[in-house]
């Protein structure tokens, strides 16, 4: 497992997702997925998170959302 992600809140338009690039309990940031325009934004990045690794991981999170496997529980993600 590369890291984890989980939905932390959801309303009609926005889904907020906590994620970590590690398997531990630390949170590397929060994403906001916009259902209207289809974009994902990093709204609270970790100061120690590597930007290029984060961008690659966001692609994995997006794919998990499209498959319907991302939930309110931690979802393990790997490349």
What are these regions (language model features)?
Residues 2-36:
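N-terminal acidic leader/helix
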């Amino acid at each position: 497992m590369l890291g984890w992600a989980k939905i932390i809140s959801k309303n009609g338009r926005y889904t907020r997702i906590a994620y970590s690039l590690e398997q531990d309990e630390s949170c590397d940031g929060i994403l906001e997925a916009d259902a209207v325009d289809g974009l994902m934004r990093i709204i609270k990045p970790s100061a120690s998170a590597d930007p290029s690794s984060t961008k690659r991981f966001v692609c994995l999170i997006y794919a998990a959302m499209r498959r319907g496997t991302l939930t309110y529980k931690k979802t393990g993600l790997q490349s």
